[in-house]
Amino acid sequence: MSRKYFGTDGVRGKVGEFPITPDFAMKLGWAAGTVLASTGTKEVLIGKDTRSSGYMLESAMEAGFSAAGVNVALIGPMPTPAVAYLASTFRADAGVVISASHNPFYDNGIKFFSNSGTKLNDAQELEIEALLEKALNQNAMQCVASEKLGKVRRIDDAAGRYIEFCKGTFPNHLSLAGLKIVIDSAHGAAYHIAPNVYRELGAEVISINDKPNGVNINDHCGATHLDSLQTAVMVHEADLGIALDGDADRVMFVDHNGHVVDGDEILFILAQAAHSKGEMTGGVVGTLMSNLGLELALKQMDIPFVRAKVGDRYVVEQLKRTGWQLGGEGSGHILSLQHASTGDGIVASLQVLKAVLESQKSLSEIKAGMTKLPQVLINVRLATADADSILATTSVKQAVIKAEEFLGDQGRVLLRKSGTEPLIRVMVESTDNIMTQTQAEYIADAVRAA
C-alpha cells in the first residue's frame, strides 16, 4: 500500500495550499498523537526551522496533539538532527520537525522521528495516514476529555544540549585551533548553533548567512547555493568553508582553493580515513545518484559499495540491513550511525575536520584520491504532478534506451521523479563531458515533450 501524504521526507508543499494548511497540520497532529499515545510517555517534541510559517504550523500541531491527549515540548528553531537526538534524550514518543529543508521559504513540511531518533517506518506512516484520512474526509477527529488534554511546555536549554552533543562526537585530543573556517548556516535552523560548535572547539570562525528573517532561508545561500561561501573562503583566505542547508541535515564543503567538496567526496574522505586506520567496518551505502567515481575509488581500497533508493531514509534502511555504519548522498546527507541516528550536517562536518587534522593534509589533498566522473543532472519541472505517466510514455522510454545504447559501458542513465517537488530528474554519467551533457539534454527534451 502506497503512502498518500508522506513523501520521501515527510509531508511537504507550498504554505497555504493543501496539505500545508493549519487545518491539515492540526488533524495530522491529532492522528499522529492518537497513534503514538497508544504506547509510551504521551509527549512529543516539536522543532522547526526559521520560516515564518513555522509558527502557524507549530500552533496547529500543538492543538492536534493536545486534542489527542499528548503533551508537547517546544524547542524552537532547531536543526532536524537535533530534534531526532533530543526526542531520544527526553524519552519522548516522537520528534516533529516543521521544515522544508533546502526548499524556498514559501514551502514548508512536517516530518516525524521515532523515540529512537530514526524516521518513522512506512507502516507507522500508513497507520497515521489512515486516521488522518478519516479526520479530513469524515470529520472523525475526536477530542479527549478536558482533564486528559495535552499540555505544552518549552525546553529552554535545547540548543545548549545539542551543541554539547555535537562537540562530543569530536575527539577530546584534537582541537580546531589554527583553522580558519567559514560557516554558511543558510539563514536556517543552525544559525545560532553551528558557529558556536566550531568556535568552542577552537576554530577561528567567520559566520555568514546567519541572520534569519523568516523569508531568507536558503535564499542564494547554504548547501544548495555555494557561491557566497566560495567567495567568502577566498576573501578571508580561510582553510575551508562549510555550508549547511535550512534544517542542517546536509553539509557541503569548499576547500581553500574555492572548489566544492560534495557528499560523494565527503563519503570518500570518511571511508579513506577509517580505512587508513584499520577502522572501516563493512562498506559504504550510496544511492542511485551517487557518482560512479565514488564506487571506483572505494573499490581501489576493497571497500564494498551498494546503492539504495534516493532519500536518506532508504540509506538508513540499507545501512541497518547490512550492519554498516557509513552512507549518504551527493547532496550532502551523510549518515554516520556510530555518531548519530540520522543525517547530521554538523556532526558529519566534524568527522571531515577530524580526517583533515589526523592526515595533516588540506581538505583539497585528502579528497584527491577520488576522481568524479562527469555527471549531468537536469531537473525538468512539470506543469502537473503526474510524473508517473510521463515516465511511462513510449517516447521517454525510447529516449532512455537510445541514450544507454549510445553510452554503452562508458556511462549510465537514471530517470526518477522527485519525492518532494513536481520534478523529473534526468541524470547521465559517463567518461566524457560532452557526451554526458548531450545525452542528458536529449532525454530531458523527451520528458518535456511527453
Curated annotation (Swiss-Prot):
Keywords: Isomerase, Magnesium, Metal-binding, Phosphoprotein
InterPro entries: A-D-PHexomutase_a/b/a-I, A-D-PHexomutase_a/b/a-I/II/III, A-D-PHexomutase_a/b/a-II, A-D-PHexomutase_a/b/a-III, A-D-PHexomutase_C, A-D-PHexomutase_C_sf, A-D-PHexomutase_CS, Alpha-D-phosphohexomutase_SF
Cellular-component GO terms for this entry: cytosol
Enzyme class: isomerase
EC id: 5.4.2.10
Residues annotated with Phosphoserine modification: 101
CDD domains referenced in this protein's UniProt entry, alphabetically: GlmM
A matching Pfam family: PGM_PMM_IV
Cofactor(s) listed: Mg(2+)
PTM entry text: Activated by phosphorylation.
Residues annotated as catalytic: 101 (phosphoserine intermediate)
GO BP annotation list: carbohydrate metabolic process; peptidoglycan biosynthetic process; UDP-N-acetylglucosamine biosynthetic process
Catalyzed reactions per annotation: alpha-D-glucosamine 1-phosphate = D-glucosamine 6-phosphate
Molecular function (Gene Ontology), one example: phosphoglucosamine mutase activity
HAMAP family the record matches: GlmM_B
PANTHER family membership: PHOSPHOGLUCOMUTASE (ALPHA-D-GLUCOSE-1,6-BISPHOSPHATE-DEPENDENT), PHOSPHOHEXOSE MUTASE
NCBIfam families from the UniProt entry: glmM, PRK10887.1
Protein name: Phosphoglucosamine mutase 2
Native source species: Shewanella baltica (strain OS185)
